[in-house]
Structure formats: C-alpha cells, structure tokens
Amino acid sequence: MTDSSRVSIATSTIVCVEAEIKGEVIIKEGCVVHPHVVFDATNGPIYVGENNIFEEFAVIRNNSEGQPMIIGDSNIFQVHSKCSAKYVGSRNVIGVHAHLEDGCSVSDDCSIGPKCRVFSKQNLEPSVAVYGPSNSHRITSTPNLTPTLQLEFLRKILPSYHHLYNKKKVTAAQ
C-alpha cells in the first residue's frame, strides 16, 4: 500500500497485504479485498460502501480527474474484473473479466456477465443483466441477494491464509 495517510479501511474490513491501494480510498465496514486487487485513486478518490467483495486481480481505477468514484453496498467484483465506472450502486455482480468502462454508471441489482462490458457513458437501469458476446441486455425479475454467507466465510478463512493490512477506522467526518 502506498500513501497510507489517504487510505481509510474500516475495522471489520479484511484487506490482504498483496492488494495495492493508491490515492484516497475509503473502504467502509464489512468488505473483503482479496490478494492482488488494485485500487487506483491517483486521479480521484474512491469511496467504497459496506459488505463488498473484491476478488483476486480485480482492478478498481478512478480515471476521472478529481471526481469521486462511488461504489455502493454488497457488490461482488469477480476475478480479473475491471471497473472505471463513476458510480456502481448496490447488490451488483461484476463477472469474471467483465469491464465497466470510464464514466459509465451501474444502478442496483445488475449482473454483468463474464467478459461483458458496460461501455463509456452508458447508464444501466436497475436490475439489468448484461450477457453474451454481444453484450445483450435484459431486465431481470428478481433482485440480487446480499452475499452474507460468502462474506462470513471469507472473513473467517482469509486471515488464516493471508497477512492483512493494519486498519484505521473510518470516521463519521469522512
């Protein structure tokens, strides 16, 4: 981790030391950050809500000059996913090798399939599934669930096999 004075990690959040965090990043309660995840906030801050899962090699990069990237609660960023979106709501699943391009916005309860893209400046409405090689869209009928059991399991198992970052509690002023 570089520039730790601008990084705030809540006490109940698990961040493996192999993760890379640059710039102003605030990660709230209950998140799990796997090894080799990259948070790059060198161009603007990244604010992460509660109970998100960032799997191995996920890249979260704010490419907007000075504008914050906001990630809501209970999202899953799967292995090798990339996110440069300006906003990601809550309860979204970003699939393996999926890519949220610069400036796009993802609402709540969306599912982005493996290797799918949400293109620059595109705004997804709630409950949209993006799937297939042509990035087809459809509205889903059921909302995504909060990954409670997965979070509980990861919070127990990751500390047994990985070193974790020391954390600073997120204060109310932030």
Curated annotation (Swiss-Prot):
Query: Which SUPFAM superfamilies does the entry link to?
Result: Trimeric LpxA-like enzymes
The protein's UniProt keywords, in alphabetical order, are: Cytoplasm, Cytoskeleton
Q: Please give the positions of the paired cysteines in each disulfide bond.
A: none
* Protein known as: Dynactin subunit 6
Q: Which GO terms describe its molecular function?
A: dynein complex binding
Q: Where in the cell is it found?
A: Cytoplasm, Cytoskeleton
Please name the PANTHER family in this protein's record. Answer: DYNACTIN 6, DYNACTIN SUBUNIT 6
Supply one GO CC term from the record.
cytoplasm
Q: Which InterPro entries match?
A: DCTN6, Trimer_LpxA-like_sf
Record Gene3D superfamilies: Hexapeptide repeat proteins
- Sum up the protein's function in the record's words: Part of the dynactin complex that activates the molecular motor dynein for ultra-processive transport along microtubules.
Gene Ontology biological process terms from the UniProt entry: mitotic spindle organization
Protein family membership = Belongs to the dynactin subunits 5/6 family. Dynactin subunit 6 subfamily.
Q: Which domain of life is it from?
A: Eukaryota
Query: What quaternary structure, including any partners, is listed in this protein's UniProt entry?
Result: Subunit of dynactin, a multiprotein complex part of a tripartite complex with dynein and a adapter, such as BICDL1, BICD2 or HOOK3. The dynactin complex is built around ACTR1A/ACTB filament and consists of an actin-related filament composed of a shoulder domain, a pointed end and a barbed end.
* Species this chain originates from: Caenorhabditis briggsae
Major location category of this protein = cytoplasm
